[in-house]
Design a protein with these regions (language model features):
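Short alpha-helical "recognition helix" segments of helix-turn-helix
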Residues: 28-34, 61
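Key DNA-contact positions within bacterial/archaeal DNA-binding proteins
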Residues: 30, 41, 70
Length: 82
């Protein structure tokens, strides 16, 4: 028996960051980058879906927003596998 095909568009972690965190909190990319102590270009590229979430970035996001780094890395892995 074959498994059903998931036809949903893969979601980049940058979209989640942009739509679920930055927009609702009214937080700018530059403000988040400063809070995470990373270059603003890193966060800009992630929210533009041009850069992957690394373990380092995942740890920083988890510390800042709560939750765990594994969740961010799982989002990235799911995106990469689709």
């Amino acid at each position: 028996m074959s498994r059903p095909v998931n036809r949903m568009r893969p979601v980049h972690p940058g979209e989640i960051l942009r739509e679920e965190f930055l927009a609702p909190l009214g937080l700018s990319v530059n403000a988040l980058a400063a809070a995470l102590a990373v270059p603003a270009t890193r966060i800009h590229e992630i929210v533009k879906e041009r850069r992957a979430i690394t373990a380092d970035t995942a740890e920083r996001l988890a510390r800042h927003f709560g939750g765990d780094a594994a969740s961010w890395l799982a989002l990235q892995a799911d995106f990469d596998l689709k």
